Amino acid sequence: MQRIDRTRFDVIVVGGGHAGVEAAAAAARLGAATALVTHRRATLGAMSCNPAIGGLGKGHLVREVDALDGLMGRVADRAGIQFRLLNRRKGPAVRGPRSQADRKLYARAMQEALAATPNLSLIEGEAHDLAVVEGRVTGIVLADGRALPCAAVVLTTGTFLRGLIHIGERTMPAGRVGEAPALGLAATLDRHGFGLGRLKTGTPARLDGRTIDWAGIEKQAADDEPVPFSSLTDRITTPQIECGVTRTTQAVHDLIRANLHRSPMYSGGITSRGPRYCPSIEDKVVRFGDRDGHQIFLEPEGLDDPTIYPNGISTALPEEVQRAVLRLIPGCERAAMLRPGYAIEYDYVDPRELDPTLQTRRVAGLFLAGQINGTTGYEEAAGQGILAGINAARLAAGSALAVLDRAESYIGVMIDDLVTHGVSEPYRMFTSRSEYRLSLRVDNADERLTGRGIALGCVGAARARHFAESQQALAAARARLDALAITPSEAARHGLALNRDGIRRSAFQLLSYPEIDWPRLAAIWPELAAVPPRVAERLRTDAAYAVYLDRQRSDIAAFRRDEAVRLPASLDYGRIAGLSNELRLKLDCVRPHTLGQAARIEGVTPAALTLLAAHARRADAAAPAEA
């Protein structure tokens, strides 16, 4: 990555957060001359809130970004200082890899990855305006007046669009602490008629770990065998650390209740919605009044950084109240507050303004990714960013744009949810959002998406080679399992109790039994001991879910049939007899691309779908004549 080496680009990405870096790197991997515009080079890849990657649902997104040769997984593996596999006791489909990260190491590793990316230039500056001619973006204008022409723009503005920080009664315009908001771009989007709304998020105070009484605090260790995010990572080499666990007390809750009138969420200073699944401590105290305490994870921000992130007490109370609250938390009675917590409000664009490609419908060549689309979280941003970057590069090259659907990825689930339903609060990924989650597991992200990425041009040679080798190893091991078989009598001699029905069962079928693991199989067939652990674990999961996956494949086939029925972009819903006015308004707002997407709009009835299918068939029949 160079500072700037040209005056015209194929793709310009605005914003260097988690969506922006993935968008820029993806576009560059496709061969597009790409510029990444950010206020300061030093903030590229910054973790603005919690120093962690992954988690339930989110870990799936990281694996999918990695499968498309994105950066987040590899960078998180380099910077991770506490790896834990969440939901380990539950089924493989809902387990979530998570890593506490060294904040400085993560940013440095991300910047190094970008620097090693060909076709990518860095421009330090503020994007102030879009150049739009006849409904198509032709470039951007920087705050210093420089015009940068291009074929496609990706906006990844995070919380910067008219960002406003709240700490008690005090407010300050900012995109995050110490950085100015993006006012010009917000005005530009207004001018072009985009539907803008306001959302809010928050962050807790930062503490000095040297002033915390760790002796009386419960410790949470990293996993003994860290599970990496990237399929290209053989093992984790970064030292692993412990986190602390403490709780709020009744005295904390009483103090917060006594000062609710000073919190902007309760004084009327903030009226926008925040993330439901990451509430402030004020919201926790109000919504869960019967609880005598709320868990707080004391998470170190780095191996050589004393800063502690107290996960669980995001707040916008006045600074002096925050200090008083700390005095009442076990272990934090003498903790020094390095920076107060705050809430931040920002503009977002109604994601129903987007196509599933993440291109806006109002301005051709303009793509949006990340919090500007109403999502929350680094991983959600990265998932959108990589698809937006791919499609921006493909548009610049004159190629067809790509869509990831619900049946192949959590990225597809997220984008379909956004463009179909919009948001009323910041959108967070959970495995429960997918109806195909047995098929969309963290262990098969490569199989689902890397081949697709190779076809799209976003996967480099090293990953393509690794993918081919791993698929060959998987296929060979599966073929061996299918070829090996045993009768119930033979199994009994090995200590396995099977139904005495005389039926020979393959090793793959045996692997579906909960009590039969890979070592038990290897005791019967010693050659299986040579199968790599990753391959063995993957095959055991496939075997355990085999019956259910067969059913799900049938469901996915039905889904794909509905997705194959395209609805004309010019379809006038107001002229379709039999649709209620309410449905006409909803359909006109979303403008579904397929019959399947229309079916997912709230209130759309089977009768309405029949009418839409009839219009789609008529449009298909008329297409050859029009051509």
Swiss-Prot record:
Pfam families: GIDA, GIDA_C_1st, SAM_GIDA_C. Its cofactor is FAD. One of its GO terms (molecular function) is flavin adenine dinucleotide binding. It comes from the Bacteria. PROSITE patterns: GIDA_1, GIDA_2. Keywords: Cytoplasm, FAD, Flavoprotein, NAD, tRNA processing. FAD binds at G15, G16, G17, H18, A19, G20. GO terms for biological process: tRNA methylation; tRNA wobble uridine modification. NAD(+) binds at residues 274-288. One of its GO terms (cellular component) is cytosol. It is found in: Cytoplasm. Homodimer. Heterotetramer of two MnmE and two MnmG subunits. NAD-binding protein involved in the addition of a carboxymethylaminomethyl (cmnm) group at the wobble position (U34) of certain tRNAs, forming tRNA-cmnm(5)s(2)U34. NCBIfam families: mnmG_gidA (TIGR00136). This is tRNA uridine 5-carboxymethylaminomethyl modification enzyme MnmG. It comes from Methylobacterium sp. (strain 4-46).
